[in-house]
Amino acid sequence: SSNEMYAKAIFDTWKFDASTINAFGGEDSIKPFTKYQEKGIFIWCKSSNPSSQDFQDLNVVSGIQKPQPLYKTLAHKSIEWNLNSNLGLVVGGTYHNHLKEIREICPNMKILVPGIGKQGGDLRQTVSTSPENLIISSSRSIIYSENDKSNDNIKKAAKKMNSEINSFR
């Protein structure tokens, strides 16, 4: 399948440690990735951009469950699919209420959190909502923290972000 070739390129050729993926093709579309047991796989669940609601907030019916937003269905499915304990979710830091709901569904799953910093996600709310198993991404706030994009300034901004994260735990 195409996803088998994507997974092979990502993990075997390029030697990535983790990847974000789209699960809209269902379980068959993520199996080629999850079979790499030492690699992290993060399913897009609730992205940080405003128009994520166009699809991710739509109510869906799956099996015998009552209608619920697609992001909750993805969270429930990710538990079923996490056979190798290498699956996580992408949940935007711009939606801490959604993060709280998803954390209730998946209490121990790793969550990649984009949207902190330039996109307006609140770091304090995000960490206080879910203090454990978060991987917080604040790329633009770190790389473009000052006009001088030197390694020293990037390192300084990364250390500052790390200190802020730890202060809210």
Q: At which residue positions do the language-model features occur?
A:
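A C-terminal functional module that forms or caps the active site or interfaces directly
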Residues: 89, 93-137, 141-142
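Short acidic/glycine-rich loop or secondary-structure boundary segments that cap or lie
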Residues: 28-30, 50-55, 97-101, 120-121, ...
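Short C-terminal domain-edge/linker segments immediately following a structured domain
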Residues: 22-23, 49-52, 76, 80, ...
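Conserved anion-binding
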Residues: 1-90
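Electropositive phosphate-/nucleotide-binding environments in soluble metabolic enzymes
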Residues: 27, 65-68, 72, 96, ...
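C-terminal helical cap(s) of enzyme catalytic domains, especially alpha/beta-barrels
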Residues: 124-133, 138, 144-169
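Generic structural signal for well-ordered alpha-helices
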Residues: 7, 30, 75, 99, ...
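Surface-exposed amphipathic alpha-helices with a cationic face
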Residues: 34-36, 79-82, 100-106, 158, ...
